[in-house]
């Protein structure tokens, strides 16, 4: 029964049920809220409406051909299912769940023929007598055709295969997969170990790995038929070597763990958890990680799949190498690690499915960080940065490259020959630690040498489909191993992206993807200490130190020379003795312009109005052989003559115009000439010297004594009445046009009258 009626409880129930549950079971789960006899009918109706809204927001109702209605989770919430939700529910309290099977029922085999099993794309018939019902009491009897049609997927009859939903939930993988009640008897599970092996896409692990476990745990069981025969039927030249035999610590058969029902069997959880611990203790022997990495509950592969010791990598890589070449994929080549610390393992019994949402939110910043680093590593043409922790070696690169065939890591002196299988470096995605922890795993050199293999795909971190669909290009591996605690320092020290231009050291040869997979180390302190250089391997194999362009790291604040700074300060303050002293030390300072206002020494002297300083500067420039431009313009277009006119320094104006021949017709950025800045206190000689126009009063003249005669007042009223303000040019032209029209009409009338008088 449900503990509350909420959106979270409904979504949690659907996720635990595998994303698909019968309508009757869903109503029965929330029966205490929908049919509470102690609640009024109005409240019950309100609860029903609210429940319908909850269901419609996250799921849809679909009907099978037999009329059974199922509530199916929408695709946008499929990421919440994880590894638990993709598995089928097991029997609860001994009740079979045969009615929930949607894949086609197997046809009844003829006498003397075994069951046809479809594993790994090959069909085999195991010869043997048909067991009688007395010999195997738990064997399923043939059901009627109605029950078989009820268990089939609707898409099988139309398209010949199950729909995407059934394939994701693992209900249409193979026609010979037994129902959950077939797995209750240990004898049946021992006789058919290959049937108990789930699909690789559902459980996140290859099916043959689970079959190997079942063969080890089951006493006296028939060895699995699939690995040698199925691979030979698929066209593989060699058969995969089996895992090294180990004594089975438990004499119980392996049962298929499912998490699709709302309540799991406690005994089944304990047994599965115990077998997991024993298997990890025997095979992996991996210590608990110091920093718990966030887990993606919806991904097929666990986040710590890179954490592999040598023996596991050897066994899995050997078996993966014998798989048929067309079946090679990213999921088949990367092994799965069963770690006790992984939250996605069903034995831990997570409290709620919504931890996947929390993990998704916690990984949001990391995905953005990895995406930015991948984008920066793709666009930049430089090689690895210098290694942190070796400051005494100076500019020592992380990978000292003599050729593309052999790479050497100076951190732990790990040699990576080209013929070896890829070396996987575990990458802890924890946020709480400041120091990154790395585990380097040596691999066997000749594990893949005797079998031709496709190139190993480039590693990339899986993210949800909605996030990965935004970018059209493939992400390259990240250039850093974790988020640094000081993000601001990391962002400041990062090199800005450059345009994709050919490097000066030559075009870099594309390395073999299957040669080595090494995650580069990065540290914010090391990057900040050496931001202007990088090591780039050239064509001949030697590494070269290529400095970056200084323009990319130029600060927006341009530092001034000490003498230039003092020159500007002394000119602005009017300290002419210090100005002349600096001038004789460096005469070129007279041509220096202020970076803010664009003023030169002539501008500052004209602004202050010091005539003696101007004469000394001009004479000193003539002696030093420096040609002063008296018409130089500032940032606002002012010449020294403009500034002298603005401040009313008549002596400086006369010296600039008469002796230095400064031009008086230059306009500034406002379009004004120097004489337009003169005030009324300036003499007429200065006005004429600056070329002011003649014949017009420069300043308006008003009569001191105003006339009070009535005739003058009436005349002024008439003038003011006739002068009106027009709102637009069209109105003004319209009035003028009317005047012209009336005048022309008056002339026509007048001439006609004259003609009439003349005719009389």
Swiss-Prot record:
Residues 379-394 have a biased composition (Low complexity). The modification Phosphoserine is found at residues 132, 239, 728. Residues 82-152, 171-268, 370-396, 445-512 are annotated as: Disordered. Residues 238-250 have a biased composition (Pro residues). Residues 460-473, 492-503 have a biased composition (Basic residues). Signal peptide: none annotated. ANK repeats lie at residues 597-626, 636-666. Keywords: ANK repeat, Phosphoprotein, Repeat. It comes from the Eukaryota. The keyword Phosphoprotein applies. Residues 191-203 have a biased composition (Basic and acidic residues). Belongs to the SOWAH family. This is Ankyrin repeat domain-containing protein SOWAHB. It comes from Mus musculus. The lineage of its organism: Eukaryota, Metazoa, Chordata, Craniata, Vertebrata.
